[in-house]
């Protein structure tokens, strides 16, 4: 690209105009408009550091620190790519001696980011610039944008309560920019560091658990869990046509149940710092959901529902004796992929049948074939948290979307999964100190690792279609869906997740801590009639009805043998708030009565 091309390039010219409009919208606090304009800039110039930095600030003001962190991190990646590209090369784009390496994706990204940054500098200049002048201006521009990105990233992680990661980027800022006077007044890494330490000490005083394991707990924060205002992929799940379509699918899995639109209580989002029961600030009202109802009696021990899912993952498919597609036990005869198989009888991707291999290759395997994801599996298996499997569900969703060239949120396996409700958008939203953010947030799991997984599949995350497909809000929407509906099977010996899966129809069953059905996880999920009085049994009992005709079928999203407070903690993630089933309300009243009795005794 030479000087003439830069000055005439329609995308660059449009991008420049949009940036000015977006900045004006941001200044007047028209935040959704500003976000839309910055996103449009990225569709014209997808390697634009400035657009990522400013959209990051916009997300932070909108009350989405998680999305702000994602944009700021991508801006830093572009800045690093530019620096690497500039090493040992002439600066003016299009120079004949410029070294080009088409096989180096990192260099290609740096080249595109360099051209975009150089072009904006050139468009702002009234005359052609010499190389030394360009070098000086580029350094000033890149340094300024990187400093802003680092500071916004640290602030965003602080707001999301990922304090350890926030400190990491504050330290990076202090190292890169030791002279604070050379930075804009609003960028102060030392002041931000001091504030983070103060918040950490405050949290330790509020919750003693943070004193015991601060390095882990201070990396896990939270963020808003909602349908983003710009998310146009979420279907109207309560439309009569949608419900009819889902019931047609349900008929393939069970003839004894049907999906209906129901009203469920709005869940309480507040709690005290120690996770104890609050007796005030209750919420009331109801909201629409889907539920599953019995069309005829279902008996204890009767398996009445079966559903397969291609979104089934193994914690270590290369060393498992389970089918990578359906999670069934492998027999003596199994199928492999020659491109993945290394000749070691103890490793490699394996399927239990020709049919499973065919399905895998048609749906997702080409994007994963012969790729090295060992680092992902090692990280997953190092954790005992069942949420670690969500990274693997993301990976398979990405692979399916890439293979089928379909937006991740439009995949049939994902589209109708319940993750969040569409709530009214409040531009002046600020999270309450008592409000537990309903979507857990971890910077590694939800920002850096997904980017690394996409890069392993040769996805340039800055390409226009990648911005739309794999922007962080898409990842967060998927994460919310997986937290809400994913099932998992834990290995009896290690206590770690062995299998996880998401099933569309399974997700339609609502939760109760006093369920009338129970399930078994695998590539195929089975529902069986259940009663806490009878306990778990595989024997069909014709004499005991678990669910009467016309009643709602209630599954369970947590271990129902736990006590009230532990169940509330475990169910919070899937439900997005306090469980308010009949059992919990009854036990909550008992806890409240005990508390009032204790207070009465102390007052005497």
Give names to the regions the model predicted.
Residues 1-604:
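Short alpha-helical interaction motifs and adjacent low-complexity tails used for partner binding
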């Amino acid at each position: 690209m030479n000087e003439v091309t830069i000055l005439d390039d329609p995308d660059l010219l449009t991008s420049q105009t949009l940036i000015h409009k977006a900045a004006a919208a941001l200044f007047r606090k028209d935040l959704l408009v500003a976000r839309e304009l910055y996103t449009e800039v990225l569709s014209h110039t997808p390697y634009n550091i400035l657009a990522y930095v400013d959209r990051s600030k916009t997300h932070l003001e909108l009350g989405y620190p998680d999305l702000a962190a994602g944009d700021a991190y991508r801006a830093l990646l572009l800045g690093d790519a530019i620096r690497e590209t500039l090493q040992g090369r002439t600066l003016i784009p299009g120079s004949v001696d410029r070294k080009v390496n088409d096989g180096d994706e990192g260099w290609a990204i740096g080249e595109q980011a360099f051209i975009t940054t150089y072009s904006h500098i050139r468009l702002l200049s009234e005359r052609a610039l010499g190389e030394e002048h360009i070098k000086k201006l580029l350094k000033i521009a890149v340094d300024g944008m990187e400093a802003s990105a680092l500071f916004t990233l640290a602030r965003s992680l602080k707001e999301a309560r990922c304090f350890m990661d926030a400190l990491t980027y504050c330290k990076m800022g202090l190292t890169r920019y030791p002279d604070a006077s050379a930075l804009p007044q609003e960028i102060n890494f030392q002041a931000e560091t001091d504030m983070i330490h103060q918040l950490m000490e405050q949290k330790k005083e509020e919750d003693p658990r943070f004193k015991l394991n601060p390095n882990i707990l201070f990396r896990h924060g939270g963020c808003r869990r909602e349908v983003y205002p710009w998310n146009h992929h979420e279907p109207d799940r309560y439309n009569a046509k949608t419900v009819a379509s889902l019931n047609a699918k349900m008929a393939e899995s069970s003839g004894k149940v049907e999906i209906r639109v129901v009203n469920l209580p709005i869940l309480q989002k507040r709690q005290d710092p120690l996770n104890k029961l609050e007796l005030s600030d209750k919420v009331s009202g109801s909201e629409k959901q889907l539920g599953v109802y019995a069309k005829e009696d279902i008996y204890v021990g009767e398996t009445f529902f079966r559903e397969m899912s291609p979104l089934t993952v193994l914690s270590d498919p290369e060393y498992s004796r389970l089918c990578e597609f359906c999670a069934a036990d492998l027999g003596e005869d199994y199928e492999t992929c020659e491109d993945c198989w290394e000749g070691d009888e103890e490793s490699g991707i394996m399927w239990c049948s020709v049919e499973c291999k065919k399905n895998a290759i048609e749906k997702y395997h080409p994007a994963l074939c012969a790729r090295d994801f060992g680092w992902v599996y090692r990280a997953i298996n190092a954790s005992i948290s069942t949420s670690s499997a969500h990274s693997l569900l993301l990976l398979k969703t990405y692979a399916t979307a890439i293979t089928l060239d379909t937006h991740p949120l439009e995949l049939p396996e994902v589209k109708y999964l319940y993750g969040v409700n569409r709530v009214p958008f409040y531009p002046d939203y600020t999270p309450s100190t008592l409000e537990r953010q309903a979507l857990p947030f971890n910077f590694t799991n939800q920002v850096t690792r997904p980017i690394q997984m996409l890069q392993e599949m040769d996805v340039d995350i800055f390409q226009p279609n990648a911005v739309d497909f794999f922007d962080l809000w898409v990842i967060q929407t998927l994460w919310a869906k997986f937290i809400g509906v994913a099932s998992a099977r834990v290995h009896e010996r290690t206590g770690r997740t062995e299998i996880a899966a998401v099933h569309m129809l399974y997700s339609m069953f609502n939760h109760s801590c006093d369920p009338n059905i129970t399930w078994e996880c695998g590539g195929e999920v089975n529902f069986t009639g259940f009663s806490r009085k009878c306990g778990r049994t595989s024997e069909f009992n014709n004499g005991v009805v678990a669910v009467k005709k016309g009643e709602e079928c209630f599954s369970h999203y947590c271990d129902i043998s736990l006590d009230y407070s532990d169940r509330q903690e475990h169910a919070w993630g899937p439900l997005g708030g306090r469980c308010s089933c009949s059992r919990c309300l009854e036990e909550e009243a008992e806890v409240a009565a005990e508390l009032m009795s204790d207070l009465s005794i102390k007052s005497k």
